[in-house]
Design a protein with these regions (language model features):
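Glycine-rich beta-strand-centered segment in the early N-terminal region that forms part
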Residues: 39-56, 71-120, 165-167
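C-terminal capping/lid region of NAD(P)-dependent oxidoreductase domains
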Residues: 2-4, 13-18, 267, 271, ...
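C-terminal substrate-binding/catalytic core of Rossmann-like NAD(P)-dependent dehydrogenases/reductases
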Residues: 255-267, 271, 309-359, 367-368
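Hydrophobic/small residue at the entry helix of a nucleotide-binding pocket
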Residues: 181, 205, 231
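Helix-to-beta-strand junctions that scaffold the AdoMet/dcAdoMet cofactor pocket
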Residues: 294-295
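NAD(P)H dinucleotide-binding glycine-rich loop of Rossmann-like/cofactor-binding domains
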Residues: 75, 86, 106-200
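Adenosine-nucleotide cofactor-binding segment
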Residues: 196-202, 215-285
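Glycine-rich Rossmann-fold phosphate-binding loop(s) that bind the pyrophosphate
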Residues: 178, 201-205, 305
């Protein structure tokens, strides 16, 4: 089958990182990413299914790995070479449309009894990511055994497969996985109707977090920080009460929360601020901003995949902030244990998520696709994806 594969190569990673993630280097013959014919993944156990991807998104975590600036923390939790692509809508061999829930927890791996985290309905935190009939991997798209959405075939356990409602186009369904991540983040943040909430970043994760917060935990006021015009328009359409530019964010959040400003030697801080801030970029500057924007005793939710970033912990310490990660999905205790993917699939039709998707590229145009995705915001795009429908 035709697929893009990502290979573990320290020299290639160092070369790409030294280039600053230049797309010409990151997709060259000297990089970790290769396009070619590879064997189809084998069914690892009885009951597993073959899935033919239709659309598969290019995620920020994919770009971080391809661009050489991903955190190496995840390397031992990954097997190589793998076919990327964990945002997938596809078809089963009987023609039915499905989306894939990528987490490779105990149930998927056939491990009994399940580990404590899987028993809690948190397969993304599975203790057994190295065990069972498939190789190491937290998710489909980072596991050598399963394939991924950037190939013509992947394999999935029945527990990973969700039927796509007729009301959803393929384009909208391609965003169910990241939307489920954001639903999980919104529920972890737990905003109340008296809270002021700030979402930092308005790429795919930021925009979908705006939508998830508005739908599942609507606050008193929801403010999005967005850099580009298309992002600002979409943030408002998805439920933000106000959208502000990064350069104006500190002052605008100060006024919105009636906070006081104190100027120091090299930076300013707020006395007061947002009750909850969702950080949806994963860079040091945006993480630092999220901390600065949040009131004493408030909550910062890290939703965007961070790299090895430096953050000044003094503010976290002195302000007694609660900083929490929001990774993947599972079952949501605040929704009577319902699966995050089910919540996302039910909520998605009214959001018209297809407006966030495009342009679409063939696998053969992967170099153009990656380059476009690396500059998506500036180019007026949100989710660039591969189209394998033929």
């Amino acid at each position: 089958m035709l697929a893009l594969t990502y290979h573990r190569s320290v020299p290639a990673f160092a070369l790409v990182r030294a280039s600053g993630g230049n797309p010409e280097v990151a997709t060259s013959a000297l990089s970790m990413l290769h396009l070619g014919d590879v064997p189809e993944p084998e069914l690892p156990a009885a009951g597993w299914m073959r899935v033919l991807p239709s659309l598969s998104g290019i995620c920020g975590s994919d770009l971080a790995a391809i661009g050489g600036h991903a955190s190496l923390y995840l390397d031992p939790l990954t097997s190589y070479p793998f076919v990327p692509g964990h945002e997938v809508v596809g078809v089963l061999e009987d023609g039915s449309r499905v989306v894939i829930e990528p987490a490779l927890g105990c149930v998927v791996r056939g491990i009994e009894p399940v580990c404590p985290r899987c028993a809690e309905g948190r397969p993304g935190l599975c203790y057994n990511a190295t065990e069972g009939p498939i190789e190491v991997g937290l998710q489909t798209g980072y596991c050598a055994s399963t394939g991924g959405g950037w190939g013509e075939v992947l394999v999935a356990h029945p527990s990973q497969v969700h039927a796509v409602p007729a009301a959803l186009t393929d384009e909208a369904a391609a965003l169910i996985e990241p939307f489920a991540c954001c639903v999980h983040a919104a529920l972890r943040g737990g905003a109340s109707k008296s809270d002021v909430v700030v979402v930092v970043g308005a790429g795919t994760i930021g925009l979908l977090t705006v939508a998830a917060v508005k739908m599942f935990t609507p606050p008193k006021r929801l403010i999005a920080v967005a850099k580009h015009p298309t992002q600002r328009d979409l943030a408002l359409a998805l439920g933000a009460d106000a959208v502000i530019a990064p350069a104006d964010a500190f002052q605008r959040i100060r006024f919105a929360t009636a906070a006081r400003r104190l100027d120091g030697v090299d930076r300013s801080l707020l006395l007061g601020g947002a009750d909850i801030t969702f950080e949806c970029v994963g860079r040091a500057d945006s993480l630092s901003d999220a901390v600065r924007f949040t009131r004493e005793g408030g909550v910062v939710v890290a939703v965007g995949m961070p790299g090895d970033e430096r953050v000044d912990w003094a503010a976290i310490w002195q302000r007694e902030l609660t900083v929490m990660g929001a990774y993947a999905y599972g079952s949501e205790p605040k929704r009577k244990g319902r699966r995050t993917f089910e919540l996302a699939l039910e909520a998605a039709p009214e959001l018209h998520l297809e407006r966030l998707v495009g342009p679409l590229f063939s696998l053969g145009d992967c170099r153009d696709a990656i380059a476009y995705a690396m500059s998506a915001g500036r180019l007026g795009a949100v989710k660039v994806a591969f189209d394998l429908r033929g």
